[in-house]
């Protein structure tokens, strides 16, 4: 049996590392960069901002690249090649050691998902309002030229506003972020084991920028969205009933689970 105390020790080590602190700083800055102009609109219009901007922001291809690139940075040292890690490898054996690494990846993916949403809310303080729906600000951005007028770095896709309730979109996005990050971490771990850590990082970087590439190609060839897991963290890239240009949520979940099994 793998002792829970050992797993928690490894997980605590990852969370308290300088690498993770740098990640938190970078993610916080990225959210501030993209969301801060909303506060300017809020101050001018007098409208509060609902706390559901996370799904809209993750559907922005440029933010998605930054978000996934920072996750690659976090996963780049799994497995850790240090002396302590090698000691645990010898002590636990290959199978148990591998299981511990996979559990760590899942925990990190969950923490990153929850932390990123929390940061997106904190960034908007004190302009947050307790609105259970999307609120006026996001509809204003979607239906007017406010995004260009106030130099916003992301749009408010009307496709999302019209097809999803705010909390539904949030839960769906967080679920997809968790699944995609877990797949990314497991894939990088597997590549580093069978090939090298350098190749795993290269794979991660290609994975991180793939939403930008797919966004350009999909205008003429929509089918490429079916083969880009990284693009699925933005629910504007996931189809709904009678929309066959994008993979459905069922297709997405099944594909990620299949990819993850193959990676493992």
Residues of each region from the PLM?
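Aromatic- and glycine-rich beta-strand/loop motifs that create alpha-glucan
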Residues: 1-26
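Alpha-helical transmembrane segments
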Residues: 262-264
């Amino acid at each position: 049996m793998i002792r829970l105390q050992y797993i928690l020790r490894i997980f605590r080590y990852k969370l308290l590392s300088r690498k993770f602190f740098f990640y938190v700083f970078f993610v916080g800055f990225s959210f501030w960069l993209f969301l801060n102009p909303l506060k300017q609109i809020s101050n001018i219009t007098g409208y509060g901002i609902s706390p559901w901007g996370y799904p809209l922001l993750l559907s922005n291809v440029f933010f998605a690249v930054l978000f996934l690139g920072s996750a690659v940075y976090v996963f780049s040292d799994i497995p850790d090649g240090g002396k302590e890690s090698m000691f645990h490898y010898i002590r636990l054996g290959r199978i148990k050691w591998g299981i511990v690494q996979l559990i760590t990846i899942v925990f990190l993916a969950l923490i990153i998902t929850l932390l990123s949403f929390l940061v997106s809310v904190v960034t908007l303080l004190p302009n947050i309002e307790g609105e259970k729906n999307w609120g006026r600000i996001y509809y204003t951005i979607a239906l007017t030229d406010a995004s260009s007028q106030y130099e916003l770095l992301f749009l408010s896709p009307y496709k999302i506003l019209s097809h999803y309730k705010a909390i539904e979109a949030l839960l769906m996005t967080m679920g997809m972020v968790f699944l995609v990050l877990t797949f990314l971490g497991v894939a990088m771990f597997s590549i580093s084991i069978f090939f090298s850590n350098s190749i795993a990082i290269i794979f991660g970087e290609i994975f991180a920028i793939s939403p930008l590439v797919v966004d350009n190609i999909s205008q003429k060839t929509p089918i490429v969205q079916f083969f880009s897991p990284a693009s699925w963290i933005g629910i504007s890239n996931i189809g709904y009933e009678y929309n066959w240009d994008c993979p459905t949520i069922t297709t997405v979940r099944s594909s990620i689970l299949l990819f993850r099994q193959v990676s493992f």
